[in-house]
């Protein structure tokens, strides 16, 4: 496997191994796509006003199946770098990591269909601030890392663990779309919070330890995952309170 000097890659302020993909991570694309996401939500809301909710059982089954498959492929291809240390803090940059992080970034735009399905099915109770915040920021941040040439080396960990968790999450969605109840749903939220806690630990280590990636990006990761952990903990507590009220009834 070909490794490159991390500092040379970072100095390019560009994808190091796949510069042909730079067009997909420039600022007009990053900003435009995420503004477009919000515009589509508003337009769909207006379209659905006065209309009956769509069922979308089979489109969602196909969508969730594709998401499980994509997430597994990304997790497997990025997981090979775990042998260089859990966080690969001092790892060299490779074309493989850069490519699969780009794929991971691209899937964040596919993930936006989670929101579109919610609006079309009129499941407004699922459309929380956490949901919108996550979808409008995660792709933008990965795009920033790619745009500045730092989505490589130790950055593999965030994409790997997110892909692994997403494989389980979309399998849950697929399973429940078939009409089954998943008794492990609560543990899935706990797993997501563990993911954020590990990403926070990863960011702290990247700040205090020697790592070729500039510390400002580790600080960005730290701050971002702190917000996600806080919001998910609020969501989890709210869900647990709701379960307790149902149990009393």
UniProtKB/Swiss-Prot annotation:
The entry's family comment says: Belongs to the ELO family.
Query: Where does the sequence pass through the membrane?
Result: 23-43, 68-88, 100-120, 138-158, 159-179, 193-213, 217-236
Its annotated pathway reads:
Lipid metabolism; polyunsaturated fatty acid biosynthesis
Native species? Leishmania major
Q: Which residues form a coiled coil?
A: none
What is the name of this protein? Answer: Fatty acid elongase 5
Q: Which gene encodes it?
A: ELO5
The cross-references to InterPro entries, in alphabetical order and at most eight, read: ELO_fam
Physiological role:
Involved in the synthesis of fatty acids. Elongates C20 polyunsaturated fatty acids (PUFAs) with a preference for n-6 PUFAs.
Q: Where mainly located?
A: membrane
Placement of sequence motif HxxHH motif: 131-135
One biological process term from GO is: sphingolipid biosynthetic process
């Amino acid at each position: 496997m070909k490794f490159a000097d991390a500092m040379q890659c970072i100095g390019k302020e560009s994808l190091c191994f796949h510069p042909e993909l730079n067009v997909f991570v420039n600022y007009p694309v990053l900003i435009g796509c995420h503004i477009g996401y919000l515009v589509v939500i508003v337009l769909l809301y207006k379209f659905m006003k006065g209309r009956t909710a769509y069922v979308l059982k089979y489109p969602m089954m196909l969508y969730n199946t594709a998401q499980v498959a994509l997430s597994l492929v990304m997790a497997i291809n990025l997981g090979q770098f775990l042998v260089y240390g859990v966080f690969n803090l001092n790892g060299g940059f490779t074309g493989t990591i850069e490519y699969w992080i780009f794929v991971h970034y691209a899937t964040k735009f596919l993930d936006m269909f989670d929101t579109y399905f919610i609006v079309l099915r009129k499941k407004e109770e699922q459309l929380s601030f956490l949901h919108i915040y996550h979808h409008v920021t995660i792709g933008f941040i990965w795009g920033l890392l790619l745009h500045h040439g730092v989505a490589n080396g130790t950055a593999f960990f965030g994409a790997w663990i997110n892909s692994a968790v997403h494989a389980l999450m979309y399998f849950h969605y697929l399973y429940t779309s078939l009409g089954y109840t998943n008794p492990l749903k609560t543990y899935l939220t706990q797993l997501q919070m563990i993911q954020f806690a590990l990403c926070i630990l990863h960011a702290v280590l990247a700040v205090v330890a020697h790592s070729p990636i500039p510390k400002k990006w580790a600080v960005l990761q730290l701050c971002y995952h702190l917000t996600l952990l806080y919001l998910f903990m609020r969501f989890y507590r709210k869900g647990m309170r709701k379960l307790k009220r149902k149990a009393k009834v």
